[in-house]
Amino acid sequence: MRDFQIRELSRIAELAQPSVTNHLNALLKENLIIKEKKGIYPTFRANREDEMFKFYKKMDTLLMLKQTGFLDYIYDSCMPDSIILFGSASKGEDIAESDIDIFVQSPDKKLSLEKYEKTLNRKITLLFEENFSRLSKELKNNLLNGIILRGYLKAF
């Protein structure tokens, strides 16, 4: 997890330092970031333990999957019974290096994901299985606790 100083955030966001300070104060008030004093200047980082932070992180992932056309591509290519986001991204606990785990309830199919991986700046891992009952108990549990992106899961 990376810490940022106000000057660095100002350069990245292309905003004046007073504006960045105002935004940081609003995020601090919502407990979405953590402020620490390291040396002369304070640093800021995401509060990855906060439930609202995790919620916003999940919503951002869902929005990106939809806006990139990824979900439509999977659906149109495979016609699955369900598409499920599972793993760390479904909990809002993923980091920049995490992959995006997607279950596709359909027969296995070779798909070109490079375009979407480049746009999302993340590796996408697809798991295909037509018959939910063939999956391990652990994987079933992960899927049942995931987020259904399209269709519905026939668990029993």
Task: Identify the residue ranges that each predicted region occupies.
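Catalytic core of pol beta-like nucleotidyltransferases
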Residues: 1-81, 90-97, 105-156
